[in-house]
């Protein structure tokens, strides 16, 4: 993957545009997400480990909001269940193009990997096939809040018995002091990874109208309302967490 450093917000902007997964972001995305999301590499690699426990023969594994395919690559590294295939979906043309390049590179390096189909499209309009694993890795937070339950209901309907949804998201907190503390610690994390105060402030301005995080309680309530029977948090680092939802 690209090692180009993220300098998108390094220079003062007269007007900060809303964040978008365009070609500029795609070029620096691996660096951006590693330096911005605490625990991201751990979540991605272990998502593959978890998926291997739920994958069922002759079923689909979905990577929804696949970006550059990091989760898809983890699924292919860890899942060895017969007849499985991965469907990776993203609505950014730039992301999809680069994702296909990276996955082709993975194919050339390894044998016996799960087949993968990369689709450019809207996951809200996706025709889901019977699935044993669905990964929503930092994707739901970019979907309009009033459309989230319907999407999760459709995912639940597509899941086979014994399957799982693995949902990773940035969190907000209902307790004001807890929210302020973890927000400050997240800023400290970004500073420690080389982001300037200007970069942090401009990125916050760019993303605040685009990304709408929920609390852990809201995620649990929504997942149960969508038909899931059990919600198990398996990872949290500062204000980022990952959950397993069982049908």
UniProtKB/Swiss-Prot annotation:
Reactions catalysed according to its record: prephenate + S-adenosyl-L-methionine = carboxy-S-adenosyl-L-methionine + 3-phenylpyruvate + H2O
Gene Ontology biological-process entries: tRNA wobble uridine modification
Disulfide bonds: none
Superkingdom, natural source: Bacteria
Binding site for S-adenosyl-L-methionine: 40, 65-67, 90-91, 122-123, 137, 204
InterPro entries linked: CmoA, Methyltransf_25, SAM-dependent_MTases_sf
GO MF annotation: an example: carboxyl- or carbamoyltransferase activity
SUPFAM superfamilies cross-referenced by the UniProt entry: S-adenosyl-L-methionine-dependent methyltransferases
NCBIfam families cross-referenced by the UniProt entry: carboxy-S-adenosyl-L-methionine synthase CmoA, PRK15451.1
Role, per record: Catalyzes the conversion of S-adenosyl-L-methionine (SAM) to carboxy-S-adenosyl-L-methionine (Cx-SAM).
Family: Belongs to the class I-like SAM-binding methyltransferase superfamily. Cx-SAM synthase family.
Protein name in the entry: Carboxy-S-adenosyl-L-methionine synthase
